[in-house]
Amino acid sequence: MVHLIVQLSKYIMIILFLIYTFLCFHLFKYPDKPKKQKHIYNLQRFYMFLIHLDGFLVLFVTTMDTKIIGFYIAQLVLFESIYLIYHKFYKNASELVLNNMVMMLCISMIILTRISFDKALRQFVFVLAGTIFAFLIPLIMQKGTMFRKLTWTYAGVGILGLLSVLVVGVASRGAKLSLTFGPVSIQPSEFVKILFVFFIASMLYKSTDLKQLAITSGVSAVFVLILVASNDLGGALLYFFTYLVMIYVATKKFYIFAGGLSFVGLGMYAGYHLFSHVKNRIVAWLDPLSVIDKAGYQVCQSLFAIGTGGLFGFGLGQGLPNKIPIVSKDFIIAAISEEMGGIFAVCLIMVCVSCFLMIFNLSMQMKDAFYKYVALGLGSVYALQVLLTVGGSTKFIPMTGVTLPLVSYGGSSLLSTMIIFGMIQGMYIMQAAPEKRRNIDDKRRKDHETKNRQKQTAKEPGAQGSQQRRRKPAAGGKNSTKTQK
């Protein structure tokens, strides 16, 4: 009976997620129909909560652990609270971005609970903290006016944060990534990437001449080189490509982008010969089976999980995701593919695609050049992080150690991504506010003009007398008719 429930639920979950993903892109068909959009948003939320319920129902049936029921209820209360607060205070926020954020958090809670209940519980605590940031940041962005003026503050704080990891950071798998404070570990590069985007945006906002570009490139190189020195090559790639995209869009000079790609190629060649762990990752990428007992073990296990799961997966609780090293972080997409199916994993990737399409669309709509660059940079960070994670898990690119935003286990990654989504919502609200003010001003102007016309009509000399004269001939006409009779 349990096996039947698991198998039935996986097909239901795939169908629901297919519909949800279709609606993400179907929305673009109705840009000027708010009622139609609202209906689609409500449908998305309905399917999302059904997926959430389906996943935790299966987890409970397969384990019969009552803690799962309480954990599910706590999540449901939190997610509903997110919607209530956003709808109450941020009416101009993007509903699609909000839906996608909660959808990915639902999937994260389902798969992490399947892998390790303790990890899922710790992740939920970080979700609570991230929710506070997601609520406060749009308000701060609306009230704050100094963000574009803090150029060197962003650079200084960011470089100090990365240097602290280089000097006193804890090494993990050959790279210095985090600072440890008792039981808590913080990965500063996850937060510094936001400061990095704000630094470049504020520099490009001031000017895009050759001198300004040279200064921007020099400081950006310091960020990247510190990450390289820390052996965090995944982070270095993320920062460098974000810089490259922002510079290319600001200058519209393709040779800069092409030169940057060439520089990446040279950097990878140098890294192959200078860093042993980089060499191991490239060897594992080119032929993982030849080193399956060493560097290729992670990639091989990931590919085995994706391949054996097939299109529909084994069902929650029926696979072997814990056989994959670091499955809850770097290879979460492999665990999802194995148990929820390849179709479900592709839908998740497409939801990520719809997110950064919305962010890039926001960047094009922003009138303020500073926030235009900020949205572009944050969208690039998000898109590149998804690409590096999925690409590393599927052998499309060498493994980089980057996590899947909002889905993978990790407090620093989760908090930084929820901060980014809060900033995106803040910019959506800022972008919608001028349009709202224009509509209000137009209404007030029309009302004022109508009142003026009414006053002028009432004050016109002889207006009442002319009306009486128009009525008197009519009365005289009746009397004269009677006289004639």
Model feature map: region roles:
Residues 2-3, 57-63, 116:
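Transmembrane helix-loop junctions at the membrane interface of multipass transporters and ion channels
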Residues 1-17:
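Hydrophobic transmembrane alpha-helical segments in integral membrane proteins
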